[in-house]
Curated annotation (Swiss-Prot):
A Gene Ontology BP annotation from the UniProt entry: glycine biosynthetic process from serine
Enzyme Commission numbers on file: 2.1.2.1
Keywords: Amino-acid biosynthesis, Cytoplasm, One-carbon metabolism, Pyridoxal phosphate, Transferase
Subunit (UniProt): Homodimer.
Cofactor(s) in the UniProt record: pyridoxal 5'-phosphate
Main location: cytoplasm
Name the record gives this protein: Serine hydroxymethyltransferase
Catalyzed reactions: (6R)-5,10-methylene-5,6,7,8-tetrahydrofolate + glycine + H2O = (6S)-5,6,7,8-tetrahydrofolate + L-serine
NCBIfam families in the cross-refs: PRK00011.1 (NF000586)
Residues with the N6-(pyridoxal phosphate)lysine modification: 229
Transmembrane segments: none
Amino acid sequence: MLKRDMNIADYDPELWASIVEETQRQEEHIELIASENYTSPRVMQAQGSQLTNKYAEGYPGKRYYGGCEFVDKTETLAIERAKALFGAVYANVQPHSGSQANAAVYMALLKPGDTVLGMNLAHGGHLTHGSPVNFSGKLYNIVPYGIDASGKIDYVELERLALEHKPKMVLGGFSAYSGVVDWAKMREIADKVGAYLFVDMAHVAGLVAAGVYPNPVPHAHVVTSTTHKTLAGPRGGLILSAVNDEELHKKLNSAVFPGTQGGPLMHVIAGKAVAFKEAMEPEFKAYQQQVVKNSKAMVEVFLARGYKIVSGGTENHLFLVDFTDRELTGKEADAALGLANITVNKNSVPNDPRSPFVTSGIRIGSPSITRRGFKEAEAKELAGWICDVLDNRTDEAVIAATRAKVLDICKRLPVYA
């Protein structure tokens, strides 16, 4: 018999210490990694439930194991909420991650060697959009597209590449692009060559759910997402479609199970269901609106302080600071800011002369600080502190003073009250 009062702290103090340390780090550091966010205690409660014990290969009503009548309810709730949230007629909530959701779409719609137009990783794309080190770049013929001199997606070049290479799929979406994508234009280009339009909206799903960023679901044949990032749910993946085609839905379902996964994680699916419900609340829309406001406010300060921003600004939750005109690398900036309890990630910029391990930029995202309660005033103040550290990255006094300011604001605006 298992006793409910078992705890990690008494049984495994070494592991518990690492959990406590990470909890403290999250509370005492300002998180600016664009792909990270703080999920709600309700989501964590679902993930810590007894649903973790249940194996449920298959789909609701069509399982390979018995005893699934109640987890069927859980998964159905998640499916119906996802469809309602994004305006889809089909949803698969089983992918364990965004990358696995993407892998399933490739498997469902393509054959190895088929041609895909995907955004260049160096221009803001994602590993699974055709990077040569990823399965997508190894199994498929990837033709990369990118941004123009203004930092915007070059749709003229995208159309030219589509007409020249006749891809089976055009892939939209990004991991480091601060603009607004014209999904209708991408569908128009895909239709000209008879290609599928597949959109990975992982980074902007929360913004899309709140109506503050264009929804790709009405335009694409298939859309994938993570359920964390701006959506602020558990770590996991999602596949959506507004195309009323049962054959397409069957292909996608089969590509997830049994194609790329076995049993779904029912405790995580429960967490997804909670997150989808939370995303339907009015306060979630206000949160996402503030995410964009904070991102724009930070950009204003960086520009005023003489820093270069890729594309000159932002229309979403993230932006890239470009150091190619400075004697500063992304790796150095990342390290210096870390000493001041400010967490960012080094990031390549378009036409970056430095390696991906060094880079000439950093990526900054506002979802986590906004979740803590930052408004424009705090976002601008924070951007100023970042500039102070970058301008004086070898000055221990400046770093120490900034760290003290960070600790103070983190105490005033905790992650979990």
